[in-house]
Amino acid sequence: MNKVVLSASFSLLAFAVLAGGPLDNAVLHGETDKARAIDYAPGEEMVFTLSLQGAEAFADGQYFVKWTRTGDDGAKEEGKVDAKSLPLVVKTKLEQPGFVRLEAFVIDAKGKTYTKSFTGNPNTPEGKKALNAFERKDKRVFFDGGAGVQPETLQSVPEPKDFDEFWAKRKARLAKVPMTATVKEHRSSNPSVKVLSFSVACAGPRPVTGWVTIPTDAKRKYPALITFHGYGAHFIQTIPDSGPTDKMHMFINAHGYELGREDEYYTEFYDALKSNGRTFGLDSSWQNKSTDTAYFGWMCYRIMRAMQYLKSFPEWDGKNLTAAGGSMGGLQTMWAAGLDLDVSAAQPSIPWCCDMGGRETLKRNQPNWGVGETEAMRYFDPVNMAKRVNPKCRVEITRAGLGDYCCPPSGISILYNNLKCPKKINWVQGSTHGYVPSEEHQKFSLTSDWE
């Protein structure tokens, strides 16, 4: 009898897991009373409305929404309401230019964060794909968004007085290193495209490494695209088997490691990059105290050399050169555009490290994780690079999240403000660094000289 009861209990438990909870397909939707959430004046009331969408029936007192308001003013407010009472209206204001952040998520009666369960069938090919995507997502039922006051007036701390002189010296140092390249051609699945991997000599401890795909039609010249990857403490670049037929496409890794090596090589490589226990670029106690030891300095050398190498290919049309990337890739995109005037278009998404002076000096709402503020880091701040972009270059910040506090909206606003060229920024309400709401949500764009 005991075995039967145990078996039945197990079956019920398995069914409960498969059945999931009433909020497994729900989203916590948030919006402001203004369609453009950055149009508030100092002291003007901001009204956020939060609602549950896609929820199944649940009881009073079963779930609650816990919310927190923070902002560039340093103020903090908190609250908790029964989820059955939604929609929830949160009213706040900001007396100065900057941003307010509103975070909210669902908890149960014991205060535990609600975590979604996968509701599909993992035994089908489509279900397996959906499960893999589900595992990479934030499983909370949450909203993380914000609103801004006069972001067009925001600025960072003053840039270093010798900013241009500093970079002129760096470029001169790079010029002394001959641009010798080791190139290997790889099998391409498309005979109209050739695939090359390369290692190019560079200033600093390591070369530039990556790959480039080039259309094989020798009768034409092509526009060029260079892309950069985001931060990853163990990112491994792989070589593609083809590429576009209408453009050259180069993709470099940030570090200059060898391509196609065994896993142990990359594990040892990334371990060796650590400084005082921090992964690359994050050690503010020593490495980032000086431009001579800052890891970003070596990355910038590699970007400048990669741009030179890309432009040396006879297949390039000599005029169309686009740089693109997200997060740390967005940071690298702005370095490329700020340090190479041949860049004709830049497409940074959620660009990292904007307004590095906003953390300590200006006391803005900044993340705990990331690059700390030092004077040396101001030479690498993309808000300063933005001022040097070619006035004819078209820059589109393809996504800026009002709830992204890995790359806070205040810093991205300053980047946009400092661009003196055709520019566009796409704001997304409820978007964090790695999340864009699946439901219909507020989004809007700002442009200047954009056609």
Language model feature labels by segment:
Residues 410-451:
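C-terminal catalytic histidine-bearing segment of alpha/beta-hydrolase fold enzymes
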Residues 7-16:
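Bacterial N-terminal signal peptides
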Residues 210-212, 220-231:
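Short beta-strand element of the alpha/beta-hydrolase
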Residues 21-193:
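N-terminal targeting or regulatory segments adjacent to alpha/beta-hydrolase or S9 domains
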Residues 236-301, 355-364:
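Cap/lid segment of the alpha/beta-hydrolase catalytic domain
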Residues 360-419:
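The feature captures the conserved acid-bearing segment of alpha/beta-hydrolase catalytic domains
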Residues 236-238, 304-364:
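Primarily recognizes the serine-hydrolase "nucleophile elbow" in alpha/beta-hydrolase
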Residues 272-277, 331, 349-380, 427:
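A catalytic-pocket lid/entrance helix-loop region that shapes and gates access to the active site
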